[in-house]
């Protein structure tokens, strides 16, 4: 009697089949459930990755070298002469929203229908997690297309049909400016980042004086930077570091946050947010608005 396949081999086979299923063009006569969403249990990975390790990453030399067309095919400029510095087609609009450390993509999926005409990208360093998210996004797109064909309707169940979200593998601490031009972004999300509790690990926190300056460069005046954590000490760390950058950011009032639908999605749609809710933990939210540049800048 043959032995059952090893768990690692089983996971690899599942992931390969899931990726192939969403790449193929959907059959018009196929039911909506023909393409299924991937299962997380087959994309296991450690909770965190060391940002200082020498990961083998692909990143553009500059924002003008970034190939966004492969991520947002529905928004590719139809004019074939409109190409970037590496010869790939430009988009009809720029990416405006970034989810740093996007994980399994709960925030992106939650925001997709809320901001259907806004291009959003998640940045994640873990390979298996990113593979899951991209397979999930492709599956959601195919499901929307199948539903349209089934109902003969031109309106997707979710506005935009998830064509406005994607994810890339990147180390934000090293390569964030390589992807985005000055004042390109309208929103940046940092949801439940690794708190790095030990003092000697604080240099690995995604909120710091140096990184905040990079976020301010990419964020347009009036743009918002959203943060949420379930660690109170880290929340105070965030407040302190943005308070020290008072020339660049100002904190958004609680009254404004209550009216912001993005805050509701950030608190309830992310996988970490759901876990904190199940465990009856606290969620500490702080949102900061990018100030106008001085006239001499």
UniProtKB/Swiss-Prot annotation:
Keywords, alphabetical: Methyltransferase, Nucleus, RNA-binding, S-adenosyl-L-methionine, Transferase, tRNA processing, tRNA-binding
Top enzyme category: transferase
Signal sequence segment: none
Matches recorded under PANTHER family: 3-DEOXY-D-MANNO-OCTULOSONIC-ACID TRANSFERASE/TRNA GUANINE-N 7 - -METHYLTRANSFERASE, TRNA (GUANINE-N(7)-)-METHYLTRANSFERASE
Subunit annotation: Forms a complex with trm82.
HAMAP family: tRNA_methyltr_TrmB_euk (MF_03055)
Protein name as it appears in the record: tRNA (guanine-N(7)-)-methyltransferase
Organism this protein belongs to: Aspergillus niger (strain ATCC MYA-4892 / CBS 513.88 / FGSC A1513)
């Amino acid at each position: 009697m043959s032995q059952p396949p090893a768990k690692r081999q089983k996971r690899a086979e599942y992931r390969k089949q899931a990726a192939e299923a969403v790449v193929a063009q959907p059959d018009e006569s196929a039911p909506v459930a023909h393409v299924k969403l991937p299962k997380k249990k087959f994309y296991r990975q450690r909770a965190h990755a060391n940002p200082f390790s020498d990961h083998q990453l692909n990143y553009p030399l500059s924002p003008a070298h970034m190939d966004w067309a492969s991520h947002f095919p529905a928004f590719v400029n139809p004019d074939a002469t409109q190409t970037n510095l590496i010869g790939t087609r430009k988009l009809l609009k720029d990416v405006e929203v970034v989810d740093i450390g996007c994980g399994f993509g709960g925030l992106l999926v939650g925001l997709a229908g809320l901001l259907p005409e806004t291009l959003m990208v998640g940045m994640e360093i873990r390979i298996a997690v990113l593979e899951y998210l991209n397979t999930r996004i492709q599956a959601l797109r195919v499901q929307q297309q199948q539903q349209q064909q089934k109902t003969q309707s031109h309106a997707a169940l979710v506005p935009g049909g998830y064509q406005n979200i994607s994810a890339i593998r990147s180390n934000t601490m090293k390569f964030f400016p390589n992807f985005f031009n000055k004042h390109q972004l309208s929103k940046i999300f940092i949801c439940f980042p690794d708190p790095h509790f030990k003092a000697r690990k604080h240099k690995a926190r995604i909120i710091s004086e140096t990184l905040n300056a990079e976020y301010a460069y990419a964020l347009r005046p009036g743009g918002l930077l959203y943060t949420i954590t379930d660690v109170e000490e880290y929340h105070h760390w965030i407040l302190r570091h943005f308070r020290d950058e008072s020339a660049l950011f100002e904190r958004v009032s609680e009254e404004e946050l209550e009216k912001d639908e993005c805050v509701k999605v950030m608190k309830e749609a992310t996988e970490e947010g759901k876990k904190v809710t199940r465990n009856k933990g606290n969620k500490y939210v702080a949102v900061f608005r990018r100030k106008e540049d001085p006239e001499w800048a």
